[in-house]
Regions:
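Sec-exported extracytoplasmic/periplasmic mature domains
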Residues: 49-53, 57, 62-69, 108-111, ...
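Exposed beta-sheet edge and beta->alpha loop/turn motif
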Residues: 96-150
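Short, low-complexity N-terminal intrinsically disordered segments enriched in polar/charged residues
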Residues: 24-53
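Low-complexity, Gly/Pro
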Residues: 2, 26, 39, 63, ...
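Short, well-ordered turn and helix-capping elements at secondary-structure junctions
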Residues: 5, 91, 107-111
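Short solvent-exposed beta->alpha transition segments
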Residues: 25-26, 42-44, 57-102
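Bacterial N-terminal signal peptides
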Residues: 10-22
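N-terminal secretory signal peptides that target proteins for export/translocation
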Residues: 1-7
Length: 150
């Protein structure tokens, strides 16, 4: 190998290494959302959903919109005998202004009174004020009342 070929190869490897490290340092590039609000929403939504899935409703309540917290907690306390076995979350639908989002989550659960698994859907409507990254949820459950009534 000639010195010129070796220098060209070394230069190419150096450029590749610099570009790779630069990509790691700066993370994902999102030109449509430079403040990275979508990531914060995804994380808040995931944490809330996991807390509900593990019946930690007191902690999940921290993510609920202020004027819905008490109603949420009262509804969820009725699930004290429910055992969640899993959940499936659809992708987040974020509006153009990036201040509102909707997510549908399907939980799988059972109760001692119903020894078979049933699915209950939750529609999570997330919102935030301005460019703040504090997302709050208002949730609506479909099929929850029938489960609690049994």
């Amino acid at each position: 190998m000639t010195i010129h070929a070796f220098r060209t190869l070394a230069f190419g490897l150096l450029i590749t290494a610099v570009l790779s490290l630069g990509g790691c340092a700066f993370g994902e590039f999102r030109p449509s959302d430079p403040f990275d609000r979508q990531y914060t929403l995804d994380e808040a939504q995931h944490r809330y959903t996991v807390l509900v899935r593990f019946s930690d409703f007191q902690k999940a309540r921290k993510f609920v919109a202020e004027d819905h917290k008490e109603g949420f907690y009262q509804r969820m306390r009725a699930l004290k005998d429910v055992h969640f076995t899993g959940y499936d979350s659809e992708s987040v639908e974020l509006d153009e202004e990036k201040t509102k989002a909707t997510v549908r989550v399907t939980y799988t659960m059972y109760t001692p009174a119903l020894p078979y698994e049933v699915e209950v859907s939750e529609v999570q409507e997330w919102s935030r004020d301005g460019i703040a990254n504090t997302w709050r949820v208002v949730s609506t459950f479909e099929g929850l009342q029938q489960l609690v009534a049994n």
